Amino acid sequence: MTNSISGDQPTVTTFTSSTTSASGASGSLGASSVSTTANATVTQTANATNSAATSSIQTTGETVVNYTNSASAPTVTVSTSSSSTQATATSNKTSQAVAGKITSPDTSESSETSSTSSSDHIPSDYEPISTTENIYENIYESIDDSSTSGPENTSGGAAALNSLRGSSYSNYDDAAADYEPISTTENIYESIDDSSTSDPENTSGGAAALNSLRGSSYSNYDDAAADYEPISTTENIYENIYESIDDSSTSGPENTSGGAAALNSLRGSSYSNYDDAAADYEPISTTENIYESIDDSSTSDPENTSGGAAAALNSLRGSSYSNYDDAAADYEPISTTENIYESIDDSSTSDPENTSGGAAALNSLRGSSYSNYDDAAADYEPISTTENIYENIYESIDGSSTSDPENTSGGAAAALNSLRGSSYTTGPRNEGVFGPGPEGLPDMSLPSYDPTNKTSLLTFLSNPHVKSKMLENSGHFVFIDTDRSSFILVPNGNWDQVCSIKVQNGKTKEDLDIKDLENMCAKFCTGFNKFSGDWDSRVEPMMSAKAGVASGGNLPNTVIINNKFKTCVAYGPWNSREASSGYTPSAWRRGHQVNFGEIFEKANDFNKINWGTQAGPSSEDDGISFSNETPGAGPAAAPSPTPSSIPVINVNVNVGGTNVNIRDTNVNTTNTTPTTQSTDASTDTSDIDNINTNNQTDDINTTDKDSDGAGGVNGDISETESSSGDDSGSVSSSESDKNASVGNDGPAMKDILSAVRKHLDVVYPGDNGGSTEGPLQANQTLGDIVQDMETTGTSQETVVSPWKGSTSSTGSAGGSGSVQTLLPSPPPTPSTTTLRTGTGATTTSLMMGGPIKADIITTGGGGRIPGGGTLEKLLPRIRAHLDISFDGQGDLVSTEEPQLGSIVNKFRKETGSGGIVASVESAPGKPGSAQVLTGTGGDKGNLFQAAAAVTQALGNVAGKVNLAIQGQKLSSLVNDDGKGSVGRDLFQAATQTTQALSSLIDTVG
């Protein structure tokens, strides 16, 4: 058999005889020995430009392949002898088959072990190998029951050649280390004829098995690079392999008998049709992918065969190839077999890409559809091609035509999955590309709405897609609903007046098209304000009067715009009676023309709405609320602004008593300005037990925010201005709310103030804030009031004690400046002066009967303040101010000047002291002597009457003295010589008399 190839290579005549010995481990073919001796002569002729030179290479060798069922490591022995001679321009290949051995003249001599002149495109991986890169470029496999002279022709019931990357290829693990130094000698197709076989290396029937170069047990070998480094002649073995498969036995693998089909060599006759430039295939080693052909019947396993004339071509790496790791890194430099044409048909064809008959053509990777791809070398350099063989694999299935390479029809069809699986081409890569969601178009559908429901309209218009379609015309917002022939109107941007307006042909009652709808909507918006004004001012009152209904709020339900006569007629609302049958139309139903303005000349244009500056429809959840979720954390709540802010009263509880500080409050503003820094809303009353409830004035200490010291009235006070007056107590401040509770469950502050207000009204009677008639002794003090309100929420009613009077007097101008108040007293108090703010301060209440000395506050120069400067002058001023500023319920009613703080500051300036300071000395009082008065029977009644009269007289005297002190009229009671004897004697006499009467009453009673 002669085969000539025209190409760019020189003419080569090759005589090859090789012997290969190998032993394989168990699990390959079993214990067997195969000896194959081949001697072949191949003549190839090529015409080069301006050259007719030819060359002949004769190689003679003998190869013996021995297979043993051994578990030891395999060994390979290759003996080759070759010679090279120069031949004439034309040489013939002669071969003779003698009992399975081909003999030819032995003209070989020692020569090179590789024919490097046969190829110009050797990849860097295979420097010593010259022809391995182009071995699998074009494999035409013909399987038939009859002879064929062309490898592209087929006859009989066609066979399906599997694609390069067969369906079982994905099962392989083809690690890079395994095959980088291996030069494509691993894989040969094995043909099995006439009967089914589960083992592609075994044969049954009359078939002959072509063992591969490395034998059928190749998977048992260690495929390391070191194994094949010394092998130099394996690259030229596959140049021309003819495999014959027929219905009868054959002793020579190159010979065929019967109706056998010839398999052209890897570099078949049609190879010259391709541009096989070296640059195309530099990085291609092309050994990894061969498809398997199965004829005559369906098979789900490409390695198995069934049918009479079927032949199974195993893949290059055999059926056991699935044992290998087929990592992508293996084939980085491999672009693998871009040109494999597989022809399957019932008739001859001169073009491997074309098919005729009832068969389907498997296009090669570089097949007819490959022209759609840009096949530049740069395209596929980074492609490792073990996973992607250009995504165009056509699978041919015989028996009938098929338009879908993955589908099968007919009796003998078999579906070969593509490299990327049969499911890869079942649908688009992004099946949801046209649906809502990721990778697709957004959902632009509009919600529905109820045109008769205002809330539904507002909800509809608040949708972002709807807002993007809204327009503005003449200050009105509109949404044109072309589906309903209507528009939603927001007059003048007032969302509370939103309404839906239906627009129809007035005669036919049909909906308008889009153009007419937009035109009429523009006219309506342009004349809406003028129409509304004319309706409200003229038409509606007139029509309401005619209809006998109340005017106002009656909107028209229909407006007809006549484009022909350029008029507008409005029809008012029809009530149920007017809408009933047989009712004479009223004024509403007759309609009246209204002025719409110049809408027929030129309607205003629609404009887009800038929602960045224009407010959208309001909803119930408008506004953002910030709530502190951590109790006790975050900034304190600011006081709520109110024009009726009340003064802040801080209750300072000390060991010695309770200070009620009325802080300065600017009532002209709406925000309370407290002067304390405390945020403790509770009041500590644990140290309030020592408060004497017999005096209400000694517990009041009035300061302002500028005062550093604490002052008191008729009590123990501090003479140091720097003391804060809070050594042991806590300060309570109501900063956040005028009605804040004192303590957790205490009463509101205004309730406490109301109780204080009632108490002050009693102890400071008379006009002008009680400046001339108080304070009077009562049954409880101001501290008692506050304490009761804090603890129980209620307080006792304040009642003045007629026999107790808080009397004091200033001394004469030139005297010692002291006034003694002589009243009945319990045991005298120690003659020590205690600081009001000291930790051991005692009660500040006045002790009954003890001599009291109140120093007159003088100016810095030592002179006496004209008109007096005692602390008692301040309280009436505060009392008068409170009467003006607060009503009987304790609510602030006046914010007129002066303020409370300014009153205190003015008093401080008048006294000339840095603070309100007064000292009180307590001395042991002289115990009064009582004499028992005796009388005869019947005098007891007179005695009681006399005692009552004396007591009343003394009360009058005490009241007059008190009035004199308050009115600064002491000069009429004491002498100016400084002795003050008159006043002192009077009080001493009153004291003695009172004591005597008390003893008498006790004795008599």
Swiss-Prot record:
UniProt keyword Phosphoprotein, yes or no: yes
Q: Where is this region: Disordered?
A: 1-36, 74-128, 191-214, 343-365, 611-645, 661-748, 792-847
Q: Where is the composition biased (Polar residues)?
A: 1-10, 191-205, 343-357
Q: Name one GO molecular function term.
A: SH2 domain binding
Taxonomic superkingdom: Bacteria
Keywords recorded for this protein, A-Z: Phosphoprotein, Secreted, Virulence
List the InterPro entries hit by this protein, alphabetically.
Answer: Chlamydial_TARP, DUF1547
Entry GO CC: extracellular region
Asked if the Swiss-Prot or TrEMBL record annotates the protein with the keyword Secreted, the reply is: yes
Q: What is its main location?
A: secreted
Q: Where is the protein situated, by its record's location annotation?
A: Secreted
Modification after translation (UniProt): Phosphorylated on a tyrosine on attachment to the host cell. Tyrosine phosphorylation is temporally and spatially associated with recruitment of actin to the site of chlamydial entry. Phosphorylated Tarp seems to remain cytoplasmically exposed on the inclusion membrane at one side of internalized elementary bodies for several hours after entry.
Residue spans with biased composition (Low complexity)?
A: 11-36, 74-121, 661-700, 715-734, 831-846
| Primary role | Appears to initiate or participate in signaling events that regulate the actin recruitment, which ultimately leads to internalization.
- Family note: Belongs to the chlamydial CPn_0572/CT_456/TC_0741 family.
- Any miscellaneous information on file? Transcribed from mid to late cycle in the chlamydial developmental cycle.
* Name recorded for this polypeptide: Translocated actin-recruiting phosphoprotein
From what organism does this protein derive?
A: Chlamydia trachomatis serovar L2 (strain ATCC VR-902B / DSM 19102 / 434/Bu)
